[in-house]
Amino acid sequence: MLFSQHTRLVHVDSPLGPEVLQLQRLEGREELGRLFSHELELVSSNPALPLDALLGKPMSLALELPGGSRRYFHGIVARCSQGAGAGQFASYQVTLRPWLWLLTRTSDCRIFQNQKVPDIIKQVFRDLGFSDFEDALSRSYREWEYCVQYRETSFDFVSRLMEQEGIYYWFRHEKKRHILVLSDAYGAHHSPAGYTSVPYYPPSLGHRERDHFFDWHMAREVQPGSLSLNDYDFQRPGTRLEVRSNVGRAHAAADYPLYDYPGEYVQSQDGEHYARTRIEAIQTQYERVRLRGCARGIGAGHLFHLSNYPRLDQNREYLVVGAEYRVVQELYETGNGGGGAQFESELDCIDAGQAFRPLPSTPVPVVRGPQTAVVVGPKGEEIWTDQYGRVKVHFHWDRHDQSNENSSCWMRVSQAWAGKNWGSIQIPRIGQEVIVSFLEGDPDRPIITGRVYNAEQTVPYELPANATQSGTKSRSSKGGTPANFNEIRMEDKKGAEQLFIHAERNQDIEVENDETHCRRPARRRAPASSSSTAALRATFSAWWSSMSSAQSPHCTTSASPRATRARVARRARMSPARISAGLPRRYACTSRRRDGSPHSGCCSASQRRTRCNRSSMVGPPSAGDIVSIKWECLRVLFPGPECSRRAIAGRRS
């Protein structure tokens, strides 16, 4: 038999069959919280193997252990190539990666709401068709109100979430699969059978049959001793959220602090969790022990106890956080001999009592500018908001939601003025397009900073024909049509200036003190003819008679609240008038108090019970007189003077 793995140290099980490929060399690396990679150099008697038959398929290696058991290295063929070969054998190169590596080949933009990070991670795995994972987590995790995967691979997304929460993973290998183990504490790890204790033998003692270590190296490095985090919660703006976590070390430079903002939390207990997680990740770099030898059964994620080392304090339990492997098998051309084989590993370890956390290394996505989105809400609603005036939106990039009240988190809306129970407010309505910015570019922290029109949500005035018009126009809700609106509009076209106010139903004006309406008289015109003067005089005579008979001589007090605030809007249409031409131009909306001082609007509070001062007048005004308007006050039962203006004409020389 020309090609057989029967006596080989490492056996290859590939999709092409058990005897098609044989291992010549293996170089592999695995690490807690990182993807493993095994580079294989393989040989085959077939020089024309179909590479696509390997690519993306599972492959495993079986390493012979003392006692006849086996340790497996299982993975997905991520890459394969063919070289020139050696002698009668064709040469192939294969890279094995975990199934998790396939998540580096897919990306998405997606929103998760009201879920814990472990649940988000497992949902991502399942949605992509993977089920070979195990939950060995022991700590509790907060529920994220809003979590966004934004323009990043699914691997980067789950990796940065795990790094933030202090979760890591490692792989348990079997013959037909490898299982990802989610971990966060010592209890997730174990010692492999036969490797609870591994001895150290120095190289001077020569070759030993038992698996052992022959090289040891320890290093310690100064690390920050504490970490403080801070953040802000708009629902509790006065609450101090700063937290601190520290790890004590017995050297002279152990107390240097770190501080960071934002900590990405709104509850202090969550901040304490994040501060502790981050300082523990930093402290995993404080002490590292590297052991080199032939310990074939130990890999990343395993526990073992070192024995027989001369420095006694180093004979302790370790957690393997990283491992490198090298296997070399000599070529042979018959099935009668196995050729020479060699296995060597180098383990990166920490004290088993030191909590392991992965150092953050995954890039966090940054939204590099504002975006637009569409306001959404429940079916049948036109306005959907909460007590803070927040709204929900559908992002144009989100292909998973249904454009309803569950499309996003509540988002605060920037207003022109925001005081304590005062300011301005306009709630974006369902269907309107808004501008969304992100605090520090974080896709998890959106805020609405503006609104824009589009081809469906069009401007209220036809443009560019009405470019001189500006103002505010609303829409009645629910069920309002274009004919149902309130509006304040200004027209700035030269010669056609206008302030237009439209109330769809009621217009109520409440005035606490004076309200003055002044009308500038028309520009000087030619003197009126005698006939027009006579007609004007007759008009004023009739007006005076009606007003004199209708007016009460003093201010009155109303006993009916209904005649107060809602009727303040009653307008006196009469304005002061200049009767004859040629007089100096002046404002004609003057009234006077009892003492003769000018007064605009209603009488003051001190004058409410006094007689209204009325100029003495005998008969109606004549041509050449200036007519002034006085007002009768209507006192109310509510605070604040509110006036129903009734014109009383007086004549002034």
PLM features: what roles do these ranges have?
Residues S81-L96, L180, R326-L347, I383-Y388, ...:
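Short, solvent-exposed secondary-structure boundary/capping segments
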Residues E39-L49, Q283-C294, P360, W417-G423:
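Short alpha-helix capping/helix-loop boundary micro-motifs
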Residues A86, K116-D119, Q123-D132, R139, ...:
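Extended, domain-scale alpha-helical bundle/helix-rich regions
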Residues R97-W99, N114-D135, Y259-H273, P378-N406:
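Glycine-rich, acidic and aromatic/proline-enriched surface loops and short helix-turn segments
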